[in-house]
């Protein structure tokens, strides 16, 4: 694709037809893709749609270090943030399932050290997506004229509450109780940094942010 906006639009076209589709880009690329992305939150999906953002804290190879968790909050879509290579695989698989269950695009946030990491990853058997691939005409869902968008806005708010309930039961959000005097809240790679320096502290580890 010529740019990130077009890449996300092509990904959405595949999702509309029922295919599972993923778009991957750097954090600044999401700025370019923000136009269709914000509307995709209203439209929802047919086949699962995942947007992977690779953020760059400390500006290892980028022009800024924006935190794209703000995009997920802005668009009211779920975001998963893996802390190692195994979770990167597992959370991406889960992201497709959540996307189809809740009719929403899902973001997965990597950062520089996750993207450059190596590790042993346990694989599973390939899963055949359950949705047949076919073009569906659904004007009220896929055409965001104001009259339709107002209805979908209400859907987004209802979906947000359902996602909140899911997050509260999600196994990737967990507590590790050790030293009761000090607790650290982490998400993604910060969990690994914390455990390396303070192995005996207690942790709230967030996999869905």
Short names for language-model regions:
Residues 82-209:
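Flexible, low-complexity linker and terminal segments
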Residues 1-101:
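Thiamine diphosphate
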């Amino acid at each position: 694709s010529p740019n990130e906006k077009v890449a996300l639009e092509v990904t959405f076209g595949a999702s509309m037809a029922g295919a599972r589709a993923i778009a991957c880009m750097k954090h600044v690329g999401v700025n370019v893709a923000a136009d269709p992305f914000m509307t995709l939150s209203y439209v929802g999906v047919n086949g699962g749609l995942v947007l992977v953002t690779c953020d760059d804290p400390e500006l290892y190879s980028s022009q800024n270090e924006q935190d794209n968790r703000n995009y997920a909050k802005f668009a009211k879509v779920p975001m998963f943030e893996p802390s190692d290579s195994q979770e990167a695989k597992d959370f991406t698989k889960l992201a497709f399932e959540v996307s189809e269950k809740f009719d929403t695009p899902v973001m997965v946030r990597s950062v520089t050290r996750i993207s450059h990491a190596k590790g042993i990853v346990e694989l599973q058997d390939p899963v055949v997506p359950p949705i047949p691939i076919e073009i569906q005409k659904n004007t009220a869902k896929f055409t965001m004229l104001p009259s339709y968008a107002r209805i979908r806005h209400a859907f987004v708010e209802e979906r947000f509450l359902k996602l909140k309930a899911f997050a509260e039961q999600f196994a990737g959000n967990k507590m590790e109780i050790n030293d009761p005097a000090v607790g650290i809240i982490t998400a993604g790679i910060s969990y690994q940094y914390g455990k390396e320096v303070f192995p005996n502290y207690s942790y709230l580890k967030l996999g869905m942010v």
